[in-house]
């Protein structure tokens, strides 16, 4: 387990969520899918969100049930272990719909 403070992990989640939103704010799905650099940057930011979530202890997570902790860790696992099978349509939906919600919920924490 990491010796970093929970606040540091929450900061990582917020910073990475902000990055995802910034990287994709002025583009549509076609530009996302055709721009390898943006795809890689978004995937890396989502991996960081999941990795940071993984290190937040269960007692803390239980205090904030509106944050999808397990789903964030699960997405990280999919992105890292099944890279060649990524569903980019689903990933785009996560970027546009779920990441802003995650950001909002983590800001409340």
UniProtKB/Swiss-Prot annotation:
Molecular function via GO: nucleotide binding; RNA nuclease activity
InterPro entries cross-referenced by the UniProt entry: HepT-like, HepT-like_sf, HepT_RNase_toxin
Modification sites for O-di-AMP-tyrosine: 83
Cellular component annotations (GO), alphabetically ordered: toxin-antitoxin complex
Disulphide bridges: none
Active site feature: 76, 81
Keywords from the UniProt entry: Hydrolase, Nuclease, Nucleotide-binding, Phosphoprotein, Toxin-antitoxin system
Gene3D superfamilies per UniProt: bsu32300-like (1.20.120.580)
Highest taxon in the source lineage: Archaea
Motif (RX(4)HXY motif): 76-83
EC numbers, comma separated: 3.1.-.-
Post-translational modification note: Modified by cognate antitoxin MJ1379; probably at least 2 successive AMPylation events occur on Tyr-83.
Quaternary structure annotation from Swiss-Prot or TrEMBL: Homodimer, probably forms a complex with cognate antitoxin MJ1379.
Biological role stated in the UniProt entry: Probable toxic component of a putative type VII toxin-antitoxin (TA) system, probably an RNase. Probably neutralized by cognate antitoxin MJ1379. Neutralization may be due to AMPylation by antitoxin MJ1379.
Family assignment from sequence similarity: Belongs to the HepT RNase toxin family.
The protein's name: Putative RNase MJ1380
Species name: Methanocaldococcus jannaschii (strain ATCC 43067 / DSM 2661 / JAL-1 / JCM 10045 / NBRC 100440) (Methanococcus jannaschii)
